[in-house]
Design a protein with these regions (language model features):
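Feature marks hydrolase-like catalytic cores characterized by long aromatic- and Gly/Pro-rich stretches
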Residues: 69-188
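Anion-binding catalytic surfaces of enzymes that hydrolyze or transfer phosphate/sulfate esters
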Residues: 1-115
Length: 188
Protein backbone atom coordinates (compact mmCIF):
# COMPACT_ATOMS: atom_id res chain seq x y z
CA UNK A 1 0.00 0.00 0.00
CA UNK A 2 1.15 3.49 -0.58
CA UNK A 3 1.42 5.77 2.43
CA UNK A 4 -2.07 7.31 2.47
CA UNK A 5 -2.43 9.56 5.53
CA UNK A 6 -4.65 9.82 7.42
CA UNK A 7 -6.28 6.53 6.38
CA UNK A 8 -3.17 4.35 6.47
CA UNK A 9 -0.19 6.23 7.89
CA UNK A 10 2.42 3.51 7.29
CA UNK A 11 5.36 5.82 8.02
CA UNK A 12 3.93 6.64 11.45
CA UNK A 13 4.38 3.00 12.46
CA UNK A 14 7.77 2.47 10.87
CA UNK A 15 6.24 0.55 7.99
CA UNK A 16 6.47 0.87 4.24
CA UNK A 17 5.01 -0.76 1.17
CA UNK A 18 5.96 -4.35 0.41
CA UNK A 19 8.36 -4.84 -2.50
CA UNK A 20 5.61 -7.11 -3.85
CA UNK A 21 2.88 -4.51 -3.39
CA UNK A 22 2.50 -3.66 -7.07
CA UNK A 23 2.41 -7.35 -8.04
CA UNK A 24 -0.23 -8.18 -5.43
CA UNK A 25 -2.33 -5.09 -6.23
CA UNK A 26 -2.25 -6.01 -9.93
CA UNK A 27 -3.41 -9.55 -9.14
CA UNK A 28 -6.07 -8.48 -6.63
CA UNK A 29 -7.10 -4.89 -7.42
CA UNK A 30 -10.01 -5.10 -4.96
CA UNK A 31 -7.93 -6.48 -2.06
CA UNK A 32 -8.63 -3.41 0.07
CA UNK A 33 -12.43 -3.53 -0.27
CA UNK A 34 -13.06 -7.25 -0.82
CA UNK A 35 -12.16 -9.31 2.27
CA UNK A 36 -11.73 -12.57 0.33
CA UNK A 37 -9.37 -10.98 -2.20
CA UNK A 38 -7.51 -9.41 0.74
CA UNK A 39 -7.15 -12.83 2.39
CA UNK A 40 -5.76 -14.33 -0.82
CA UNK A 41 -3.28 -11.46 -1.23
CA UNK A 42 -2.14 -11.88 2.36
CA UNK A 43 -1.91 -15.67 1.94
CA UNK A 44 0.45 -15.21 -0.99
CA UNK A 45 2.70 -12.87 1.00
CA UNK A 46 2.68 -15.19 4.04
CA UNK A 47 3.74 -18.11 1.85
CA UNK A 48 6.30 -16.16 -0.16
CA UNK A 49 8.08 -14.84 2.90
CA UNK A 50 7.68 -18.21 4.66
CA UNK A 51 5.87 -16.71 7.60
CA UNK A 52 3.26 -19.46 7.38
CA UNK A 53 2.93 -22.87 5.78
CA UNK A 54 -0.85 -23.00 6.14
CA UNK A 55 -3.62 -20.44 5.83
CA UNK A 56 -7.39 -20.53 6.11
CA UNK A 57 -9.46 -18.30 3.88
CA UNK A 58 -13.17 -17.92 3.42
CA UNK A 59 -15.93 -15.60 2.38
CA UNK A 60 -17.79 -13.78 5.11
CA UNK A 61 -21.48 -13.17 5.64
CA UNK A 62 -21.38 -9.49 4.69
CA UNK A 63 -22.46 -8.20 1.32
CA UNK A 64 -19.52 -6.90 -0.70
CA UNK A 65 -20.48 -4.69 -3.62
CA UNK A 66 -18.40 -4.48 -6.77
CA UNK A 67 -17.19 -6.73 -9.51
CA UNK A 68 -18.80 -7.47 -12.87
CA UNK A 69 -22.14 -8.52 -11.33
CA UNK A 70 -22.35 -5.62 -8.86
CA UNK A 71 -22.27 -8.05 -5.92
CA UNK A 72 -18.87 -9.54 -5.15
CA UNK A 73 -20.04 -11.45 -2.06
CA UNK A 74 -23.69 -12.20 -1.23
CA UNK A 75 -24.91 -12.53 2.36
CA UNK A 76 -24.64 -16.05 3.80
CA UNK A 77 -21.46 -16.79 1.85
CA UNK A 78 -21.93 -20.09 -0.03
CA UNK A 79 -25.62 -20.58 0.60
CA UNK A 80 -28.65 -18.31 0.26
CA UNK A 81 -30.41 -20.55 2.77
CA UNK A 82 -33.99 -20.97 1.57
CA UNK A 83 -33.65 -18.70 -1.46
CA UNK A 84 -32.21 -20.00 -4.70
CA UNK A 85 -29.23 -21.68 -3.07
CA UNK A 86 -28.13 -23.42 -6.28
CA UNK A 87 -27.57 -20.12 -8.07
CA UNK A 88 -25.80 -18.70 -5.00
CA UNK A 89 -23.51 -21.72 -4.80
CA UNK A 90 -22.71 -21.51 -8.52
CA UNK A 91 -21.84 -17.84 -8.06
CA UNK A 92 -19.70 -18.55 -4.99
CA UNK A 93 -17.87 -21.50 -6.56
CA UNK A 94 -16.96 -19.23 -9.49
CA UNK A 95 -15.81 -16.56 -7.01
CA UNK A 96 -13.69 -19.01 -5.02
CA UNK A 97 -12.12 -20.61 -8.06
CA UNK A 98 -11.32 -17.29 -9.76
CA UNK A 99 -9.65 -15.96 -6.60
CA UNK A 100 -7.74 -19.20 -6.08
CA UNK A 101 -6.71 -19.31 -9.75
CA UNK A 102 -5.08 -15.91 -9.27
CA UNK A 103 -3.36 -17.17 -6.10
CA UNK A 104 -2.05 -20.17 -8.05
CA UNK A 105 -0.65 -17.85 -10.73
CA UNK A 106 1.16 -15.83 -8.05
CA UNK A 107 2.55 -18.98 -6.44
CA UNK A 108 3.74 -20.28 -9.83
CA UNK A 109 5.66 -17.05 -10.33
CA UNK A 110 7.67 -17.46 -7.11
CA UNK A 111 10.65 -19.82 -6.85
CA UNK A 112 10.64 -22.33 -4.02
CA UNK A 113 13.98 -24.03 -4.62
CA UNK A 114 16.42 -22.67 -7.19
CA UNK A 115 18.34 -25.98 -7.28
CA UNK A 116 15.29 -28.02 -8.34
CA UNK A 117 13.49 -25.27 -10.23
CA UNK A 118 10.37 -25.78 -8.15
CA UNK A 119 7.93 -22.93 -7.68
CA UNK A 120 5.89 -22.20 -4.55
CA UNK A 121 2.93 -23.75 -6.36
CA UNK A 122 4.78 -27.06 -6.76
CA UNK A 123 4.64 -27.44 -2.96
CA UNK A 124 1.09 -26.19 -2.40
CA UNK A 125 -2.22 -27.97 -1.80
CA UNK A 126 -5.52 -26.12 -1.75
CA UNK A 127 -8.62 -27.63 -0.14
CA UNK A 128 -12.00 -25.96 -0.72
CA UNK A 129 -15.14 -27.14 1.06
CA UNK A 130 -18.66 -26.02 1.79
CA UNK A 131 -20.17 -26.75 5.19
CA UNK A 132 -23.14 -28.78 3.92
CA UNK A 133 -25.28 -29.39 0.87
CA UNK A 134 -28.95 -29.01 0.10
CA UNK A 135 -31.55 -31.52 -1.07
CA UNK A 136 -30.54 -33.13 -4.34
CA UNK A 137 -34.00 -33.90 -5.67
CA UNK A 138 -36.60 -31.57 -7.13
CA UNK A 139 -40.29 -32.36 -6.95
CA UNK A 140 -42.16 -32.67 -10.22
CA UNK A 141 -43.52 -29.41 -11.68
CA UNK A 142 -41.47 -27.18 -9.38
CA UNK A 143 -38.86 -24.69 -10.46
CA UNK A 144 -36.74 -24.93 -7.32
CA UNK A 145 -34.84 -27.65 -5.56
CA UNK A 146 -35.51 -28.50 -1.92
CA UNK A 147 -33.88 -26.59 0.90
CA UNK A 148 -33.30 -29.43 3.35
CA UNK A 149 -29.80 -30.05 4.67
CA UNK A 150 -28.05 -32.99 3.07
CA UNK A 151 -24.62 -34.57 3.21
CA UNK A 152 -24.05 -33.94 -0.50
CA UNK A 153 -21.71 -31.03 0.01
CA UNK A 154 -18.85 -30.48 -2.34
CA UNK A 155 -15.14 -30.08 -1.94
CA UNK A 156 -12.23 -29.65 -4.27
CA UNK A 157 -8.55 -30.37 -3.77
CA UNK A 158 -6.13 -28.65 -6.13
CA UNK A 159 -2.42 -29.39 -6.17
CA UNK A 160 0.31 -30.51 -8.53
CA UNK A 161 1.13 -33.09 -5.82
CA UNK A 162 -2.22 -34.89 -6.17
CA UNK A 163 -3.13 -37.56 -8.68
CA UNK A 164 -5.90 -36.05 -10.80
CA UNK A 165 -9.12 -37.61 -12.08
CA UNK A 166 -9.55 -39.56 -8.87
CA UNK A 167 -12.73 -40.08 -6.86
CA UNK A 168 -12.14 -40.13 -3.13
CA UNK A 169 -14.63 -42.41 -1.43
CA UNK A 170 -17.16 -43.97 -3.72
CA UNK A 171 -20.77 -44.28 -4.74
CA UNK A 172 -23.19 -46.51 -2.86
CA UNK A 173 -25.07 -48.36 -5.64
CA UNK A 174 -28.16 -48.78 -3.45
CA UNK A 175 -28.34 -45.07 -2.67
CA UNK A 176 -27.61 -44.22 -6.28
CA UNK A 177 -30.42 -46.51 -7.49
CA UNK A 178 -32.88 -44.92 -5.06
CA UNK A 179 -31.90 -41.45 -6.26
CA UNK A 180 -32.29 -42.51 -9.89
CA UNK A 181 -35.71 -44.09 -9.17
CA UNK A 182 -36.86 -40.83 -7.58
CA UNK A 183 -35.67 -38.88 -10.60
CA UNK A 184 -37.37 -41.28 -13.03
CA UNK A 185 -40.60 -41.11 -11.04
CA UNK A 186 -40.73 -37.33 -11.40
CA UNK A 187 -40.38 -37.54 -15.19
CA UNK A 188 -43.61 -39.55 -15.67
Amino acid sequence: LPDMPPQIPLNQYGLGSSPDGAKVRAAYPSFFTDPFAGQAALAFLLFKYRVSVSVTMGPDFNVVLGGPTLIANPPLAFDFSHNDHRAAQAFMWARMLNTIDTLIDLLKSEPFDAATGESMWDRTMIYIATDFGRSRTRLSATGAFGTGHDLNNGFVMISPMLKGNTVLGGVDPQTFRIEMDAVRATKR
